[in-house]
Amino acid sequence: MSEEDWPSPKFREHVIQRLEPELARNRQNAPNLPVPGDARQVEEYVFAKCMSKDEYMRTIAKVINAINCNSKSAAVPSVLQPSQFHSPPCTTAVLGTGVGTPGYRAPVPPDPQPTSAQARNPPVTTATTQASTTPSAPAVTGTVSASAAVAAAVASFPSPDSAALRAAPGGQTTPGSQPSSGAPGSTTPNAPFPNGAGAQPGAPTMNGGAGGPPMGQPPPQMGAPNMGMNGPGGYGGYGMMNGPPGAGGPMGGNPYGQPMKKEMDQSRGPWDPQGHMYQQQQPWGGMPPQQGHGGYPNRPMNGQQTTPTGTSSVLESLINQPQQYPGHHNQMAPPGGDRNAAGGRAGVPGNPGGVPGAPQRPGAMPVNQGVMSIEDQNVYQMKLRNMRGSCDSLRTRARQCRQEGNHEAAHKLEVMLSVLEGRRVVSLEYLNHLETWIARKQDFLNINPMGGGNPGHMGMNDPVMNGDHGMMSNGQVHNPYGHPGYNHGQYGMGGPPPPHHMQMHQQQMWQQPQQQRMMPTDPMMMGGGGPMHGGPMYRGDMGHEMNSPVNSHRHNPYPSPAAMRNNMRGMQNGPGPIGRDRNSMSGSMSGPSSGAPSLNTMGTPKMGAPGSIGGLSNLDDFTYDDFLPNPIDALQPTLHIGPGSSMGGGPRVNLNDAARKELQAMEGRFEIEPNHQRHDANHIIVSAKMRNQPVPPLRLVVPITYPSGNVTVDRTAIDLDAYLYDDLQNVVHERLSRPGLSSLTDYLNAWEEQVNQYMQQNQTNGGMDAAFGVGNDFFYDNLNL
């Protein structure tokens, strides 16, 4: 191919340039959770790992998206952490090959995670349970946490290759890759683990007694994902997260030792997913073989790769991990006992006494440490069923956002969709946040029709979204998080309320008159739906940072997506001032802790200071608003908007007559987004799509004084579609960067000409190459980024 095509240095250099700003943002927004290495190291790692352009492009897209998610959700790594512990060891085969060859990964230290077995169906569920990330382990430290946070967003990579990867010698780890922290026991045959005898006394057992960090202290380098309840401080979850209880899995003292698929495993012969997986997972029969210091096993992953390989370890988990979140599958719950049982289940039912040398840790965090109890799993399942009705709306909105070029918003919606459809398992706390967010963004999601017809959908008619944020219809203070257990200190501290509490809560919510439930107040516009005072700050300042360039005001929670404004325009006739400052809602209502209900949801806007109500008024921003708006588009439109802006995020941005007429003349060939975004005080972004070619939209930055002033092309920093059409985008932007183009017509004509020329050239090759031969829907549906 040409020198600009993969794998040419020029092509790779372009990818590196695209990665650098994302890594920079990651380092800035999440300094405590850095993605190790610079852009070149990351790209080289991916390049060494991938054998085809298709595989390479998909992997880069995953990395970029993961980095972006990590940067935006560094404060919530617990929600995403689990996945980091589940990367299939041999995913090197990614899309290109159906099998992961250890030799292929040889250049990069193998990922110590034994998740290949875990990737198997039954194990997957168990692994996901292990991956449960509860806020209890706030000490997310080290790059691993970052990878976890990053990987979580991309972990669920249900594409066909993931299955192959998992089936592949995922457990195989190159010899010598044993985690340093892992005891030899971890490398012992998996079979012994089911009995608990497999782990040597010295090995970190699922109890986490051996070698586990002091209670409450995260395993070395692992940060403290609360994955395990067993090990030190309940770090056993790590082990679980690491992967199938298989070799060194949660059962094995060092899941990574096994995960690394030491020579020992390799010597055992071809990877036997079931043998490997079930041998160690037999203990799961009673409970997930959590290694009290499952975290430790993970630590090997870090420790082992903290060195130059540290980067690969994080990236490995980021790229390879199948999304394994806290088990929402009941299968995950150890039938033999409560996963959350204190002592971290020193001994699995099948392993009385636990692994030798792994004393039961009475101090282990008993609840929500990383594995959900059966009761919590029931709540999780019930919530999924209740929210299942939102899937179509989320899917529609995601598609709409993507069509409008707002890929970050679309991605976030797709992640939520994958959770609701059960393709991705998350912690109960994350699900609670998602439930409340969906309830509050009812209007944005166009879920109104379901509000009255689907009483089972707890979130849709939640008073939170209807403006009755302060109290329930019966006068009881409403818990913004959607269930009694999701309040105040309980948030992330105690287990979610039992199912019957949830049912009661739902009943209370349904008691509200239909009129109130369907009230036209747009939660999005009303300060994001009301203060989420009940819980701890879920995302720290970062959430605010992303949502508002003007830190003193957080009006227009969602001005960026044009679809939102479009959807909200019809709401402008609704009662009450809708475009008030986000904090006006917070200021007008008392937090759940105050017990003082407030009915002033539709009253006069109150411009509360961001720190009002003890600083908790910002919580809704941090907790929810950063789910959808992306920091790139969401911030720009708010720059010029004042507190009195209308609900759509401020006055509509209109082009002047000259620009509008010029675009109207081109409407036969181009579809122009009617709702323009403001790029800055003097420029407006116009998004155009070709009617005859399914290519990413072109974003033109038009001066408000057009035709005076220069039109430029805006290329978002994170444009996953640009990776799907990377070659095309490179050609297009190179062409549009040449001198000679000045008017909107010039740019659109040049764009169309270049795209048609590119398509014709590719037709001779049988169409676009594999990396771009699939549509966006296929890409996102399968990658679930």
UniProtKB/Swiss-Prot annotation:
Disulfide bonds: none annotated. It holds the Pfam family Med15_N. It is found in: Nucleus. The keyword Transcription regulation applies. Residues 122-140, 174-189, 279-291, 333-343, 584-598 have a biased composition (Low complexity). One of its GO terms (molecular function) is transcription coregulator activity. InterPro entries: KIX_dom_sf, Med15_C, Med15_N. Residues 101-140, 161-228, 249-311, 323-363, 575-602 are annotated as: Disordered. Keywords: Activator, Nucleus, Transcription, Transcription regulation. Signal peptide: none annotated. One of its GO terms (cellular component) is nucleus. Residues 301-311 have a biased composition (Polar residues). GO terms for biological process: regulation of DNA-templated transcription. Its main location: nucleus. Residues 344-356 have a biased composition (Gly residues). Component of the Mediator complex. Component of the Mediator complex, a coactivator involved in the regulated transcription of nearly all RNA polymerase II-dependent genes. Mediator functions as a bridge to convey information from gene-specific regulatory proteins to the basal RNA polymerase II transcription machinery. Mediator is recruited to promoters by direct interactions with regulatory proteins and serves as a scaffold for the assembly of a functional preinitiation complex with RNA polymerase II and the general transcription factors. Required for activated transcription of the MtnA, MtnB and MtnD genes. Belongs to the Mediator complex subunit 15 family. This is Mediator of RNA polymerase II transcription subunit 15. It comes from Caenorhabditis briggsae. The lineage of its organism: Eukaryota, Metazoa, Ecdysozoa, Nematoda, Chromadorea. The gene is mdt-15.
